[in-house]
């Protein structure tokens, strides 16, 4: 098992580095072969997932390609331990925020951080910083030191370590955002015409904008600056439309919509999707704001009732096939409703009511999986 695990990890890293910038004619075949190997490994070493697959009459003989790999509902990460490796030897474990029930959170065991970090670096470089290697990063969200079991906090700490200049800084410490120090840093960057990457969760910006408005402050950021946003308003007491949020960011920081990028990620997956606008702009293409997946991730948009792929322009549940999830579940059915289009996908919101129930695991199934 150990040797097979090492070989799979090595081949995933090779795949990421081979296809992170462009795809060749062998890409589809290579992706399919690797997914099938990962599925076989998970079927043999992740017992709850094996039982789940068998309940759906899926096994190593019946699954013929990556589209047929059984999609584990994302809710399962709350109910089950989904790992091919010994969780006592895990390099890290990520917990979801648990905004509604802190004792009922998703848990994602990461046996080896090499693939997680390589996936993060490759995706970030291509989609966020296509034209530069380093930038001053100002974070509104805590890093690993203050939030050790958060995948987003590890993401932020990794971004600063790999892509941040020496004067990059995390301004969220001791459970609060240090507005005064952040404003000093923003004023300094404005004065020196220094490009910055302002990085935060969606709700962080709501609080920051309210504070700046209250104190009658705004900034004229350098034109190469980027505002990086992730998440949404799930479980928050106040919700703001993303259109309104981005309009406020544009006016407060004197940036264009093309300078604002949103990242799609979650605890249960190991790779992220991004708005494509910065990449499109860097390649002198028509700029779109749809989300795209990296080469080591494939997505499908599935009908909420039949779970069959929808046509272009239709909405459905997002299915996520992530090679970097080699040690848990390679294929996940999210609860996010998205629209499929020619340039990627657009997130509409979370599934609700009967739709959410339809993409979850029943209590009876849970008893059989444990």
What role is predicted for each listed range?
Residues 49, 120, 155-156, 245-249:
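Generic structural signal for hydrophobic residues
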Residues 19-22, 73, 217:
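Long, charge-rich alpha-helical interaction segments
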Residues 99-100, 109, 116, 120-175:
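Internal, well-ordered alpha/beta segment that forms a basic, Gly-enriched binding/recognition surface
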Residues 1-21, 55-59, 121-127, 147:
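Domain-scale activation on soluble regions of proteins
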